[in-house]
């Protein structure tokens, strides 16, 4: 089975690696163009490109694949039996979807039809899901609405973060792909249609603004936000006109009728902050311009008494 693999970030590396190790012919890899990073704006290859080059697989990096006749002609020359997509970063046009014998399949990081969209991993943590997983689906013109071919369920730990779940999902996706491909090739897979409506809201792309903590919300909701947005873009608030990133937090046992955002006190555990229905303890933080550290260490160099309020804007 001749494959073309389309993917970009770290999430898409384990499935590519698994394809190579399982002996599948990966005729080409398609990934996003190199992007400038760091202070020197040095062009950096995508993780998938780096992996492909290690295996001497030809790499293509079109700016856009829609209305790109040159790219389409290249695919026609390759004549893949199947195109495998994992977090590629562009919408796949109809003429590409219909090109391979077995069509295009997508490795999606949720138990479809739940969490269609660009950020299903973080959203599952933010929403407090007890489990999530990976779905391999046949791609159509809709966004994550194609027939489901296989699934794997992943339980979420109580301390699950977006980052920890990301790693689990990537590995599970690789394993599920290798299990599913033979049934696609042999024609024994049983596609399952998705309902038109998803039981969960669309998991839109994560933005930095989503990390702003609103302490008028329940403490449990904020604790999940902190975990879901760790490591990127991180939850944050403002104190004395400076940004304070919050990397870890736990629910306090005490109750509070203070105004949301008020610092109730500090101790070895961290900074106790009043929320809508209780207290959230910030246990690992990072002040603007400083290193990430445990709140106990932070408090040795930053005097914070009970009374001040965290705000949702720079004062």
Identify the meaning behind each predicted range.
Residues 215-315:
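An anion-binding loop in the catalytic cleft
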Residues 1-233, 278-280, 287, 306-315:
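One-carbon transfer enzymes
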């Amino acid at each position: 089975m001749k494959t073309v693999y389309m993917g970009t970030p770290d999430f898409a590396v384990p499935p590519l690696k698994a394809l190579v190790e399982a002996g599948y012919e990966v005729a080409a890899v398609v990934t996003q163009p190199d992007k400038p990073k760091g202070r020197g704006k040095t062009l950096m290859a995508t993780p998938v490109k780096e992996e492909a080059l290690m295996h001497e697989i030809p790499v293509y990096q079109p700016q856009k694949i829609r209305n790109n006749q040159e790219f389409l002609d290249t695919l026609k020359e390759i004549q893949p039996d199947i195109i495998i997509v994992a977090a590629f970063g562009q919408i796949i046009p109809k003429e590409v979807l219909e090109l391979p014998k077995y069509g295009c399949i997508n490795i999606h990081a949720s138990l479809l039809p739940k969490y269609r969209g660009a950020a299903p991993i973080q959203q599952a943590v933010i929403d407090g899901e007890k489990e999530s997983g990976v779905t391999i689906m046949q791609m159509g013109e809709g966004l994550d609405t194609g027939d489901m071919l296989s699934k794997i369920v992943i339980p979420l730990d109580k301390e699950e973060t977006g980052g920890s779940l990301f790693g689990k999902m990537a590995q599970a996706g690789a394993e599920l792909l290798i299990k599913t491909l033979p049934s696609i090739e042999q024609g024994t897979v049983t596609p399952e249609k998705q309902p038109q409506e998803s039981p969960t809201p669309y998991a839109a792309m994560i933005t930095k603004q989503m990390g702003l903590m609103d302490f008028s919300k329940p403490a449990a909701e904020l604790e999940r936000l902190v975990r879901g947005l760790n490591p990127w873009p991180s939850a944050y608030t403002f104190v004395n006109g400076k940004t304070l990133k919050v990397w870890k937090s736990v629910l306090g046992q005490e109750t509070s009728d203070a105004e949301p955002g008020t610092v109730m006190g500090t101790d070895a555990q961290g900074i106790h902050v009043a929320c809508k229905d209780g207290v959230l303890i910030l246990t690992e933080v990072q002040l603007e311009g400083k290193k990430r550290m445990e709140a106990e260490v932070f408090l040795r160099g930053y005097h914070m008494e009970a009374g001040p309020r965290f705000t949702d804007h720079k004062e």
